Amino acid sequence: MNKMLRYLSDYKRESVLAPLFKMLEATFDLFVPLVMADIVNVGIAAHDFHYILVRCGILLLLAIVGLTCSLTAQYFSAKAAVGYSTGLRHALFEHIQTLSFSEMDTMGTSTLITRMTSDVNQVQSGLNLFLRLFLRSPFVVFGAMIMAFTVNFRAALIFVVAIPLLSIVVFGVMVITRPLYKSVQTRLDRVLGLTRENLTGVRVVRAFDKEKSEVDRFEDANELLTKMQLHVGHISALMNPLTYVIINLAIVALLYVGSIEINIGGMASGDVIALVNYMNQILVELVKLANLIVQVSKALACAGRVQAVLDTKPGMEFPAQLTGNVPAEKAGDAVRFDHVSLTYKGAGAPSLSDISFTARRGQTIGVIGGTGSGKSSLISLIPRFYDATEGSVEIMGRPVRQYPRADLRSKVAVVMQKAQLFGGTIRSNLLWGSQNASDADLWAALETAQAAEFVKAKPLGLDEPVEQGGRNLSGGQKQRLTIARALVGKPDILILDDSASALDYATDAALRKALAALPGDLTVFIVSQRAASLQHADQIIVLDDGRMVGLGRHAELLESCPVYKEIYESQFKKGDAQK
């Protein structure tokens, strides 16, 4: 947990001043009962209106100064807490960007979002409360007891008995409810996870008429949360009546002892009022202290979860610079797999087994296979989204692990299955491919991706707004824009991971023709469910259950590969393939 304190290093001054100003406020509060006692003992007893007025002025001054100190402390604590959470959130987001797909798969997107949002916010709230109360509350408790002894020693002995009893009740309730609050947080995370999952997949829910089952599933989780919250609430609700019973008994004892002391001349009636006020101050601060401990406990639990993400080391290390030379015999290679196998973390069986092939520069490589055959797993090894568990993957004659991250990303462009665009404009999305691209480069990429026509039809052209996720574009338009984005960077290797599935056959064919006509030695990997889309590829890799069962051209595979022949003929008979 000490590691997380470094994000508070820029706010040391605020972290010191906030509790100091709260202690100043508490100091002024401790003098209020004494001034009130003076008003009763001297002003009211002597019917001295001027004395009462002066003491009321002192009370007003104490209130104003105390309020000023409180606001100042609040400013410094809020500044420190907000600054801390900003730095923590930035560090967390930056660290997440370094994680490989393996770590992302293990933790899950929804978990990381929770860590970035609610957990960091909880840490911020806990820190803000801690800076304001961790010194003030103990200071007031002990200060009020000391001040009570200055008023009357015998009466103050009641405080010695009452404070431990109050502490037992307050902290006893806190100890019991603390683990229960953790259970509440766990169940709340479950409810939030279900909500996020439902809202993310709302179209699928509606398509399958699953609204009722989703409501039932949410209701079950919400009911468990409600029961736990009620259980904790019932226990927490015991705090106020129990503490007030102790306080009232203590006040009765104070009044009894005070009346005796007044009769024998040991103290005045105003002193009894002061002692009662000190007792109330102690009660308030003990309750605040208990709430502080509960909130800090929640914050520490959240901080632990955030720290767990920060402690997660990236599974991949990229070198700082490219070293070594490419052997002459590999100068023409674009991609080479040498007995490559891949087993995902936590998976029982390998997703890829003993894959070997070589793709030459300028070739078009098709990848086909049934659902779950390992197509996406295979192409994810080329840009090193995952590391092969066995064998080696080479890019342009070098092992992929020798490439710095930036060099590898500039050489390999990937268009994912799900077309993902970001809020902004068409231009800003295309510039992800290369920040230095000119308008001519953007239009050239759009022409190749068969997207220029619909972009030109937009009122603002390249500056047409794009909503988050590309909600204002059709599926085919989004896919073509993501292909254009990949082409803007002019990569050596382009991977299309079933990224033309929303295109009609004519557009798909035009895209493949345009890619083949590009100058240079662009190597293209096309993952597709359509055998017709791969007929003209230089090589077609056929996968079945993670194994390569065929490698060759279309005509060769029809003769030698039963799996490919079955795929092709099943589509041809349905009229979905072209000769």
Identify the residue ranges that each predicted region occupies.
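A short amphipathic helical element positioned immediately N-terminal to and/or at the very start
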Residues: M1-D10, L112
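Transmembrane helix-loop-helix hairpins at lipid-water interfaces of multipass membrane proteins
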Residues: S9, S15-T72, F76, F149-R154, ...
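An intracellular "coupling" helix at the cytosolic face of ABC transporter transmembrane type-1 domains
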Residues: D10-R13, T98-S102, S118-L127, L131, ...
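Hydrophobic alpha-helical transmembrane segments of ABC transporter permease domains
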Residues: L20, L24, F28-V32, G57, ...
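Short intracellular "coupling" helices and adjacent cytoplasmic loop segments at the cytosolic face
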Residues: A46-H47, V82, H90-T114, S118-V120, ...
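Helix-loop-helix
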Residues: H47-V54, M147-V161, H231-R305, V309-L310
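ABC-type nucleotide-binding domain
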Residues: V326-K579
